[in-house]
Amino acid sequence: MTAVTDIIDELNDSSLSSTRLRELCLQLRKKTDTGCAITVSDEVNLIESLSYHSISPGVDIQINTDVLQTIDYYFQRNKSEHDEIMCVLISKLQPLLLKRKSNFELKEQRNLGLKPTLGMSLKEDNLMQAWVSQGGLKGIPLFYVILLHLKRRDISTNLSWIIPGILNILDDTTDIRRIKLRGVLLLQTLLNHTFMNETNDSKWIQFSSTGLFPLFEKTLINMCYFLPPSYNADETIAIWRVVFPTIQSLYKVEFLDNYTKYQYHLEKFMSEIILQNIIPRASLAYENLTLYALECTMNILRLQREGSVVHLQRLIFVLGEYIVRNPFYTTFPKLISKTLSVVSTLIKVCPNERIVAHRFDILSLILVTYDKCSQEDALNESILQQCKETISWLLNCDCAMGEQLSTLSKQPRFQLLFEFS
């Protein structure tokens, strides 16, 4: 079997193929299974070399789970040396970090008032370009792996370099996908894999005590407005897929002990970002954006449960005005299905009495969808079944619409819809 030092050399070869990387990961995991001896020094070098392959170097953020699994194997096999390994990895990472903001500057930045300084943007862009040209991007995957394995008890002693390191990447204006968005990924990892561990143990520092919430929230919310035509739709969706989950994690960690504030910020995000901006602007012109917005809508509805009632009237209006009423609605079967799924979710999570109050508005969304599809030869078995199921959910709320539904069911155009098995 190949020696660990030879594998490290191969991992550091810039021409290493993805196929060969998988083979090396398999070999390394077999070494752990057989209890093959390895020095701490070699283990550190191995984890470092593997870490550089944990995130793809291209524009799209692709996490290599094979590499992460292999790294985890080596951390697990040598738990007693975990702290020593992490200490060395951190010392290897720090020289690779972009050094643009000091702790003093971060404190100043928490004052969110506008303080323009002539020429600063150009100076910072030049610093970023120099950092990239010197191979600075190489440090981001290592940063990511360190955050994945950093223990909760070690956060406070490392925040002095973690926070500036993440913010300096987040503040980039030169390359959204390859730099700025990777900063969002690092923040998400910090929130999900460090601050969310041992959340009930008061002896460890809480995220809310750092005072960084407004700074991170402002940056993330601004990225939600990277919309067409200023940005390509594919670029926008790639940004949202990282930013939206990070915003939810940020709210969860910041308001861990304040459920009311957590719900308020989810409600604000849904109202201001999704219902007032994304869906009206994307509509059917950018199907993939609207599909993702509707998927996020369902996730927030499930998180808010009965609290979703605050969105009921607005959501019904937005679905009807910007999606269902669109004359090209029936040419987007995925959008039809997702819209019906949102309506079903809304019915399930909101209090029955509020659904009853809006029963005819909700019924109209279903009927118009069904009727349009039927009239325009777009009604397939899947859509028909979804329409029937959504009506069933509505009826389960004791909506007392027997007379109206009986009249509708006698109309030839709606007979198929009301044929329940």
From Swiss-Prot:
Question: Does the entry feature the keyword Zinc-finger, yes or no?
Answer: no
Miscellaneous section: Present with 1470 molecules/cell in log phase SD medium.
- According to UniProt, the name of this protein is TEL2-interacting protein 2
* Compartment annotation: Cytoplasm; Nucleus
Its Gene Ontology biological processes?
Answer: cellular response to heat; cellular response to nutrient levels; cellular response to salt stress; chromatin organization; DNA damage response; positive regulation of DNA damage checkpoint; protein stabilization
Q: How does it assemble?
A: Component of the ASTRA chromatin remodeling machinery complex composed of at least RVB1, RVB2, TRA1, TEL2, TT1 and TTI2. Component of the TTT complex composed of TEL2, TTI1 and TTI2. Interacts with TEL2 and TTI1.
Under Pfam families, the record lists: Tti2 (PF10521)
Q: Please explain the role this protein plays, according to its UniProt record.
A: Component of the ASTRA complex probably in chromatin remodeling.
Superkingdom of origin organism: Eukaryota
Enumerate the UniProt keywords alphabetically: Chromatin regulator, Cytoplasm, Nucleus
One GO CC term of this entry? TTT Hsp90 cochaperone complex
Q: What is its main location?
A: cytoplasm
Q: Which family does it belong to?
A: Belongs to the TTI2 family.
Claim: Ribosomal protein is one of the keywords in the record? no
